[in-house]
């Protein structure tokens, strides 16, 4: 789909927003979206760089980037503790934190003027603008909470789900709807935000889109918080019978 803004009559096209067009890379039998891979690498490099710089010279009294990283860790640890429980949360902080920070930076990256960088097909955008990215993140969440249940209870984790046909049906339904809702919620919100900003820039390129871009930075952070909190919540449910927190 292509949205375009042109002058009246036979004047040339002055701007366009492309949706659904992808730069395709062929990796053996697999076809991948090249622009998503590029922006995903950018996000990973940013996270690795910030972590390296922030922890290179640790101080007893933190300041600057170290202070920010410690605050972020405390926030993410509190999310994991509240959702998973005091006894189990520590081993899950790295996963919850990685998901939060990746989704946060991926969402924020989409608010930068990436369309200024031309590629042969499609355009650069947030990695979470691609349904493949959000599905992959959702599958990580799914595998994580199933692993958490198996680690605590073995195959007995599945036992109480099949005590009755109704519980079994509910569990099977949740098995599919949880990752589906996680992926579609994140993908839909980020795609809509970037489209709104892109169209406004086409229509009113000066000043007007700025407040919305600031708002979308906030909503991008909220989406990252929701995704990571729900992941922690699912893990907490998987271990709840073994934790006094529940």
From Swiss-Prot:
It is found in: Cell inner membrane. CDD domains: ATP-synt_Fo_a_6 (cd00310). The keyword Protein transport does not apply. Gene3D superfamilies: ATP synthase, F0 complex, subunit A. It holds the Pfam family ATP-synt_A. Keywords: ATP synthesis, Cell inner membrane, Cell membrane, CF(0), Hydrogen ion transport, Ion transport, Membrane, Transmembrane, Transmembrane helix, Transport. The chain crosses the membrane at residues 34-54, 92-112, 130-150, 155-175, 196-216. One of its GO terms (molecular function) is proton-transporting ATP synthase activity, rotational mechanism. NCBIfam families: ATP_synt_6_or_A. Key component of the proton channel; it plays a direct role in the translocation of protons across the membrane. PANTHER family: ATP SYNTHASE SUBUNIT A, CHLOROPLASTIC. This is ATP synthase subunit a. The gene is atpB.
């Amino acid at each position: 789909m292509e949205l375009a803004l042109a002058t009246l009559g036979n004047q040339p096209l002055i701007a366009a927003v492309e949706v659904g067009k992808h730069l395709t890379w062929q990796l053996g039998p697999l076809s991948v979206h090249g622009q998503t891979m590029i922006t995903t690498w950018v996000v990973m490099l940013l996270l690795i760089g910030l972590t390296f710089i922030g922890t290179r010279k640790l101080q007893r009294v933190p300041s600057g980037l170290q202070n920010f990283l410690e605050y972020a860790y405390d926030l993410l640890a509190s999310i994991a503790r509240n959702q998973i429980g005091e006894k189990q949360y520590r081993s899950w902080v790295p996963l919850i934190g990685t998901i939060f920070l990746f989704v946060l930076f991926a969402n924020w990256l989409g608010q930068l003027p990436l369309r200024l960088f031309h590629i042969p097909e499609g355009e650069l955008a947030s990695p979470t603008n691609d349904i493949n990215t959000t599905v992959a993140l959702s599958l990580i969440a799914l595998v994580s909470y199933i692993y958490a249940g198996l680690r605590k209870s073995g195959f007995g984790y599945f036992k109480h789900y099949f005590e009755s046909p109704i519980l079994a049906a509910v569990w099977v339904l949740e098995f599919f709807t949880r990752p589906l809702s996680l992926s579609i919620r994140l993908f839909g919100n980020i795609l809509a935000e970037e489209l709104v900003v892109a169209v406004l820039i086409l229509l009113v390129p000066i000043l007007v889109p700025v407040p919305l871009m600031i708002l979308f930075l906030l909503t991008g952070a909220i989406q990252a918080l929701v995704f990571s909190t729900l992941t922690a919540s699912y893990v907490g449910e998987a271990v709840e019978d073994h934790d006094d927190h529940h």
